[in-house]
Amino acid sequence: FETLYVPAANAAEATLCPEVRVIPVTSVSQLAAHLSGEAPIAPQPRWEPAAPPAAALDYRDVKGQVQAKRALEVAAAGGHNILLIGPPGSGKSMLSKRLPSILPDMTREEALEVTQIHSIMGLLDRDSPLVTVRPFRSPHHTISIAGLTGGGSTPRPGEISLANKGVLFLDELPEFKKDTMEAMRQPLEDGAVTISRASGSVTYPSDIMLVCAMNPCRCGWYGDPSGRCHCSQQAVDAYMGKISGPMLDRIDMIISVPALDFAELRENTPAESSAEIKKRVMAARAVQQARLEGSGVTCNARMQPGQLRQYCALGDEGAKLLKTAFDRLALTARSYDRILKVARTIADLDGSAEIGPKHIAEAIQYRSYQLGKQ
């Protein structure tokens, strides 16, 4: 078709469809008058998207936490899910909220896909209908399963789909209901969520980076050198036990974010900016896209078993190192695969075609955090 009649409120976004004339309509009577020639309606001017705005949040503003920033750079470069564990005030939320500032800009296809989902929920800006910035969604821990994964008598997308092509941030992870967390497992694995009703089913995309943050215990100070934590080991285990093994298996990287000491807080040396980190992330993503071209996969975190075998071969030293970690950490097969994917990303950031022992060692480090152990 060449002409599209749409509600005036949706006319600007409709012009994103190429080679279609969009007529904005406010009522049926107005449409009838237009079709009869009595009162023609002018076509909606085509909306041209501007360049994405500069990120408001920047890693330059975060003091210290060099290791955490490195881990988030690796996560961004490969699209890996990550869990940050640390005491209150250590910067977990600050670090997480700045992650979109180092992610690659969305392609037009990605922007259109995100825009479609946000349009369903009425979240678009009428003056700027194309979503050009990767979403960052941070639902409260009281959210329901339907609110998180989607639902309703007329199926609507949940937060996991509203975060599609962006970041879903779950702060205070153990405070989420267990069944709510478990409901995310399949959408995380499949990159899509299907909502079934008697009248049929609807599938929404859920291609996200999952970023989670939590305290190491209920009071928040377990393992801190200050000795402020008075939680029993049983209480710590119960707190950590709120996160199931299968859920942890879907998180590629687990890192500690310790409290800053006085010297770090007083440090005035400028931190690296998000723009500088983003350049390295984009270079690594370009390598992955070239390697995986034509496969339907665009980043290391989404590699399938056959691609793992093809692109994540290890030398003898690297294989020996990984076997030692596998035995000592009692890793699952899924955890083993995730270490390989993270190691592949670290090698890409390093500009290396081969995964070396140092890449494996760093990837193991991101998997070796023992929940509930000092």
Where are these regions (language model features)?
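Conserved alpha-helical scaffold flanking the Walker A/P-loop in AAA+ ATPase domains
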Residues: 73, 129-130, 134-135, 146-168, ...
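Walker A/P-loop
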Residues: 84-125
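Conserved inter-motif catalytic segment of the P-loop NTP-binding fold
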Residues: 110-144, 151-152, 258, 298-306, ...
